[in-house]
C-alpha cells in the first residue's frame, strides 16, 4: 500500500498561526484549513468593526489559503462556523453568502464559550483540489 503525501500549506497573506498548528494541511487532494479568526495578516490583530468585519476578514484569510493551495471557494466542501454569540448567526450568514454564492458547502455552526483573542467568529474549512462538477442526485 502506498502512503499518502501530507503537505503543509502556508501563506504570508493570511495570519500566522497563533498556536502549534498549520494554516492548512493537504493530504491527497483534500485541504484541511485551520480555523481563521478575523485577524489582519499584517498586524496579527482582530479587525475593528464587529462580527461582520471579522467574518469578512476570516473568509478573506481562508481565500488566501485556498489560493496558496491552487484553489478557490468553489473547492470548499465543508465549513464550520464558531460564534461567540449565536445571535450573530444571520449577520455572519449575510457575509458568508458574499463568498459562497452557489452550490453551498456542507456547514455546521456552533456557539462557543469564547474564541481566541476575544474574537466573535472563527471559520474552518475543508476543500478538495482540482475541478469539481456539481451533480444532482
From Swiss-Prot:
The EC number(s) this enzyme carries: 3.5.99.10, 3.1.-.-
Chief site of localization: cytoplasm
Acyltransferase in keyword set: no
GO BP of this protein: lipid metabolic process; mRNA catabolic process; mRNA destabilization; negative regulation of translation
GO MF annotation terms: 2-iminobutanoate deaminase activity; 2-iminopropanoate deaminase activity; deaminase activity; mRNA binding; RNA endonuclease activity, producing 3'-phosphomonoesters
InterPro entries recorded: RidA, RidA_CS, RutC-like_sf, YjgF/YER057c/UK114
N6-succinyllysine PTM positions: 13, 67
Catalytic reaction equation(s): 2-iminobutanoate + H2O = 2-oxobutanoate + NH4(+); 2-iminopropanoate + H2O = pyruvate + NH4(+)
Reported function: Catalyzes the hydrolytic deamination of enamine/imine intermediates that form during the course of normal metabolism. May facilitate the release of ammonia from these potentially toxic reactive metabolites, reducing their impact on cellular components. It may act on enamine/imine intermediates formed by several types of pyridoxal-5'-phosphate-dependent dehydratases including L-threonine dehydratase.
NCBIfam families recorded: Rid family detoxifying hydrolase
Name of the protein this chain belongs to: 2-iminobutanoate/2-iminopropanoate deaminase
Record organism: Bos taurus
Amino acid at each position: 500500500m502506498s502512503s499518502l503525501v501530507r503537505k503543509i500549506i502556508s501563506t504570508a497573506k493570511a495570519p500566522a498561526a497563533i498556536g502549534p498548528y498549520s494554516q492548512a494541511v493537504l493530504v491527497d487532494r483534500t485541504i484541511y484549513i485551520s480555523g481563521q479568526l478575523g485577524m489582519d495578516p499584517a498586524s496579527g490583530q482582530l479587525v475593528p468593526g464587529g462580527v461582520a468585519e471579522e467574518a469578512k476578514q476570516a473568509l478573506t484569510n481562508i481565500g488566501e489559503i485556498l489560493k496558496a493551495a491552487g484553489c478557490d471557494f468553489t473547492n470548499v466542501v465543508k465549513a464550520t462556523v464558531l460564534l461567540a454569540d449565536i445571535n450573530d448567526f444571520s449577520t455572519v450568514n449575510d457575509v458568508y453568502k458574499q463568498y459562497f454564492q452557489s452550490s453551498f458547502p456542507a456547514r455546521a455552526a456552533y456557539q462557543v464559550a469564547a474564541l481566541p483573542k476575544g474574537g466573535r467568529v472563527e471559520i474552518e474549512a475543508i476543500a478538495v483540489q482540482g475541478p469539481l462538477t456539481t451533480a444532482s442526485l
